[in-house]
Amino acid sequence: MATASESSSSKRWLPLESNPDVMNQYLWGLGLAPDEAECNDVYGLDDELLEMVPKPVLAVLFLYPITKKSEEERIEQDKEIKEKVHSDKVYFMKQTVGNACGTIGLLHAIGNITSEIKLSDGSFLDRFFKSTANMTPMERAKFLENDSQIEDAHSVAVIAGDTPASEDADTHFICLACVEGELYELDGRKAGPISHGASSPATLLKDATKVIKKMIEKNPGSLNFNLIAISKRT
């Protein structure tokens, strides 16, 4: 999804499909070791379906529809976010490229679990997080915007999807991750990370679904929701 927060750049990509197989190949190609972690579909928010998701869950990606109401809420949230201080251990970046939210969501996920997984030495992900470690969220966004390797890899992942991609996407990815005992919502279109209270690696998935249920309740008539868990391979 491309919005006002991305207006600093005229660059637009095609949106990434919410498809765990596509995302796995994408991440593994960028330097996440295949035996370290993988993306899995979450088929529903009931306890029985959540139990089917491979554990431990390291991060969650959520795709939801952009509406007038959600945009108004985002603007209001930004006013509050700017006044709050979050842990400097949270890896957060802005989104300046249209329709790059899938890639941004994956980078938010990996960037906040680097202590739990191994990245291949010298790979894109290894170099990206080392290069951007001390940057501001906007500097990270610009670094990504100017990197042709990730743009090419994103394009390949888009083509690998099961459905044709349209530039006029009306859905958006966010990431939910646990950092230092807190559940954070990471959305590059917002002013910064949003804390949703206490969490832990053991309860991350259930804690994230509580946040997600509230988001779904605000748009009950839509079916354009999708949830993907990034799980540690054991």
Swiss-Prot record:
The record marks Q95 as: Transition state stabilizer. One of its GO terms (molecular function) is cysteine-type deubiquitinase activity. It catalyses: Thiol-dependent hydrolysis of ester, thioester, amide, peptide and isopeptide bonds formed by the C-terminal Gly of ubiquitin (a 76-residue protein attached to proteins as an intracellular targeting signal). Signal peptide: none annotated. Its EC number is 3.4.19.12. The record marks D187 as: Important for enzyme activity. One of its GO terms (biological process) is ubiquitin-dependent protein catabolic process. Keywords: Hydrolase, Protease, Thiol protease, Ubl conjugation pathway. Belongs to the peptidase C12 family. This is Ubiquitin carboxyl-terminal hydrolase 3. It comes from Arabidopsis thaliana (Mouse-ear cress). The gene is UCH3.
